[in-house]
Amino acid sequence: MPAQRMRSVIPPYMLRALLTRYAPQRDCALHTLNHVQSLLGNKPLRSPTEKNARAGERSAISTTPERHPTARQTGAQGGAAQQPRRAVDEAYDHLGVTYDFFWQAYRRNSVDNKGLPLVQRALRQGLPEQLSGTASRWCSETATARSSTVSPSPSTLVGHELTHGSDRERSRLIYYQQSGALNESLSDVFGSLVKQFHLQQTADKADWLIGAGLLAKGIKGKGLRSMSAPGTAYDDPLLGKDPQPASMKDYIQTKEDNGGVHLNSGIPNRAFYLAATVLGGFAGKKPVTSGMTRCATKRCRKTPTSDHLRPRHGETRAGLRTKRGDKVQQAWASGWQWSNETAADAQSGYGH
C-alpha cells in the first residue's frame, strides 16, 4: 500500500450518504466522490518553488480542479495578500497562521522544518450544498504541503491538510487501516491545535471540532468530526449519523475509505483530547503533543504500518513525566477502552 497518497478532508462516507439520501444533489455528490477516489490513487504534484523556498513563503491560488494549481495565481507570495477575493484572502491568512503555529510552538520552519512553501488552491467547483453553504471542495497535495478550498476555510482544515505534508516527510505512515487512522488523527490533532493557537484558547475552552462551520445551514450538525465526542458531530436525515467510534471496543473493520482511516481516527482523537484536557493550558505546548509527535517522527518511521498501541504507550510515557502523570495515563486508558475481542480482531493483519 503506497504511503504517498493525496487526501480528502471530506470523508467518503459522507458523500455516500448523500448519494443514497438526497436525489437533487446525487450527481454532485457522485462527481465529488469520484474525484476524491481518484485523488487517493494519484501521486501528488510537486511544487515548482519547492527547492528555492524562503522562510514563511506561502501562496493562495484560484483555479479549477482540472487545471494545474499554479495556472492562475491570484494571491501573493511572501507578503500581504493582494487579491480581494474572500476565499483567496482567507486561505492566505490561514496559511500564515499555520506557519506561525509550527514556528512559535515547535520552532519548525514550515511543516517539514525545511521551509516548505505552503500553497493553497481555491477551487471553483463545489461540493454538494449540504456539506458547505458556499459550495466548497477540499483536497490536498501533501508532497508540497498544498490544500484546496473555497471560503469559508476553517483553520482546522488548513492545519489538517498541511500536516499531511509533514506526515509524509516525517512519519511515512501507510495510509491504510490503523496506521492510516493514526495518520488522519495526527492531522486532526494539529489542525485543532492551529485553531486553538489562532484563537488563543486553552484545552478546556476549545470546541475540538474539525470543520466547524462547514456544514450548510439547516443541517443538524456542528462539523465534520468531534475529537471530544466522536460519533456526535452530526445527525441529520440527509447525512445520516456521524459513524466515528470513540474507543477501540467499537473499532470498525471495513474495506471502504482505505480501511476506515477517517472512521477510526476518532479513537486516537478522543484519547488525545482527554489527555490534553487533563494537562490543561495550551495543548500545543504540552508533553502529550510532544509524545504524539515523537511517535510519528521516530517510532512510526520504523513501523509505518503502526497499530494504535504504539502511540498510546508512547504518549502515556510522555505524560508520566509530568506532575499529572497518573491522571494522564488514566485519560489515555479511558480513551482507548480495549476489549479482548476487539484487540484480537484489530491487531490481526496489522502492524508488524
Curated annotation (Swiss-Prot):
EC number: 3.4.24.-
Thermal response of activity: Optimum temperature is 50 degrees Celsius.
Source organism of this protein record: Serratia marcescens (strain ATCC 21074 / E-15)
Basic and acidic residues bias spans: 48-57, 304-325
Residues that bind Zn(2+): 160, 164, 184
Necessary cofactors: Zn(2+)
Main localisation: secreted
Entries under Pfam families matching the protein: Peptidase_M4_C, PLN_propep
The keyword Zinc is annotated on this UniProt entry: yes
Active-site residue list: 161, 262 (proton donor)
Gene Ontology molecular function: any one: metalloendopeptidase activity
Protein name (Swiss-Prot/TrEMBL): Extracellular minor metalloprotease
